[in-house]
Amino acid sequence: MKRTKSIHHASFRKSWSARHLTPVALAVTAVFMLAGCEKSDETVSLYQNADDCSAANPGKSAECTTAYNNALKEAERTAPKYATREDCVAEFGEGQCQQAPAQAGMAPENQAQAQQSSGSFWMPLMAGYMMGRLMGGGAGFAQQPLFSSKNPASPAYGKYTDAAGKNYGAAQPGRTMTVPKTAMAPKPATTTTVTRGGFGESVAKQSTMQRSAAGTSTRSMGG
């Protein structure tokens, strides 16, 4: 009987330890996961142009100008391209489109097609850009061009979006926000023209995915 009683005590101690150590282990794991998430995020500022950046960062005018010019070049390479001005205006609004440089990412056959139909192809103006904090350290900083539509019918209306259609909120420069580091990664060059309304569809899909991800995160945190 004593032996049996000893076995029962041992089982109880093991069971108690398992029940009480498991939450601790989970908590430690959660802390490391949260730390990993924090490291994967980056604080960025949103500016309309180099002057906005310089005003917010006195003494950093040269860096602001460099970031702005780099963002313009990136916009030429990655912005949605349209075969006609009308298609671009339908998406982004009057006065928001420009002729794109022939070498701006487009494949030669698509350049020829666009040039045959209208003499050139079109892209939206860069409405602003995201820029990593100047005091963030490391070898320089990253920037990402942003676009915005002035057509109320477009899903991108009044919003800052990147070339992939991801939404970064209201098109109001001067804001600071936290984004995943992947948001600042260079986007692939645009190699084909977009049909009318195609970019808006991308923005709508991205917004749906963002809302879904936010909802899942909220439910997970709430248990």
From Swiss-Prot:
Segments for region (Disordered): 178-223
Chain intervals with Polar residues compositional bias: 204-223
Composition bias, Low complexity: 178-195
Signal peptide from the UniProt entry: none
Domain of life: Bacteria
Database matches in NCBIfam families: PRK11653.1
Family recorded in the similarity comment: Belongs to the UPF0441 family.
Name the UniProt record assigns to this protein: UPF0441 protein YgiB
